[in-house]
Amino acid sequence: MRRRLTLIGAGALSLVLFGAGAFAADGLARTRRVLYNFDGDSCLATRAGGKGPVAVTLDDVKRLIEEVAYEGSQVDTVLVCVNAQVMYYPSTVGTLRGTQSTPAERARWPASEAQRFENLQRFFAKGVDPYAVMLSETRRRGREALLSFRMNDAHGNDFLRTKFWTDHPDCRLGNGALDFGRDAVREYVFRLIEEAVRRYDCDGIELDFNRFPTFFKDVAPAQRVAAMNGLVERGRAMLDEVGRGRGRRLVLGVRVPSNYGRTPPTLATCREVGCDLAAWVKSGSVDFVVVSEFMFERYDLPIHPWKDALPGVPVYGGIECTEGGSRALYLTPEKYRRAARCLWQNGADGIYLFNFFTTREYEADAFEPPFEVLRDLGTRPAAVPAP
């Protein structure tokens, strides 16, 4: 901000400061009792009552939002993930999911991936963007509609392979991830984020550093922080530019990197991998922070230290959908409520749900997620004082 102010006259200074203040107030004042993250690939291979991969219709896509943003639901914010190294839409910057796979690899795809690829191809061939529909339905129902962007997905599947990965072997970190120590990687990732924000009529974007929390190969911590600070600041400036054109502040949220479940994430462990949350909040770049585990629910996530260190922005606590890797370990309604109580007691400003819908991915053994808990997870227990 200081560098920008040296370039404008005194008459414009008050306007810039007033605009920034108005933007900040709008971004921070919003209530988010429950934030619901949609994995953009999973929701395009299953549907309500499905027992396996199915052809998804436009009505199915709209129903995805109806299921979580129904009357009485406490879901105030819906996040739609549109990438995992690949993009889930035809991109001029990146690679559409599955298009870099060879015919031999496609022949080995599981039925779920084959159906997902077919669904995406069919929608876009007809000129229908299912993610634009999801965001539009979310806003029509009066909810905040955000994109979610996985910063460095490392699943490593062939259908997540990108042209950038193929063309830049020097930028690889392993198993599909990229080395953010490379200028070319940070430029590429920024351009992907910018493309998504400009493409979709969204209220902002979440940068998901928890998918996956590895970013650098052989760079010292201070250099990691400087590199990531530059990327986040650039993202904030881009959002402000786009937001001015849309007449509203576009939100920037961050889901912090975990420790792969070894220990709960802390500000120190995040900074070690390049994510200086305190600096991002202090600079005004970030509007909210999500703290969560990696994959499995532990019921012990401390939020108070984050609240103490990051005054001025809400800190939300994430619930993982399962206690382990089997169908039997998915959270029951009571376990979701237990997890929410723990987060509220530990200082959370709201509840964040990730992979909630993945019970539908068990094909013949698929079952519906407990949508009924969306009515109460966002209620702060009476015994827990408001911040």
Each predicted region: which residue ranges?
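Extracellular glycoside hydrolase catalytic/binding regions
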Residues: 224-231, 250-298, 327-340
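Aromatic-lined carbohydrate-binding/catalytic grooves of carbohydrate-active enzymes
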Residues: 75-124, 214-217, 288-293, 304-305
